[in-house]
Amino acid sequence: MAYFENIDIKKLLEEDEDYSFPPFTEKDLEETEKAIGWKLPKSYIALLKIQNGGYINYEEFDECWLSAIYGISSSEGGLIDMFDNWINEWEYPNIGIPFGETQSAGHDMYFMDFSSVDENGEPRIVHIDNEADNSIDVVADNLEDFLI
């Protein structure tokens, strides 16, 4: 299955020093999945193969609080570091993978929620509000639908 055929990921994500990383290897992917305890969805891997993290270009994506997408890296700002921060320090529920930074600086997050997956095994996307007792709202059936 091809992902993101209707989205120009290179326009959506801007490279930067905080959230963009060099292309990842299969070993990097395996280490990330082992560290966070979740297998990354194929759509997220496909996105990160095009651009391994970065800030959101609001000219392309202007109706969301998402400000960056985490890349595969063990460095600061990478998925391993940020997963640990949100799950262990901020005590978000471990229902899946927090995949990007929000404009609220952590008071709410978007997660790939594995409690519900579509027919292709892709997790739904939820918004979790840390300030409202981690209330969960479904926002999209999968990552591609979320970014369209």
What label would you give each PLM region?
Residues 1-106:
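A surface-exposed partner-binding patch
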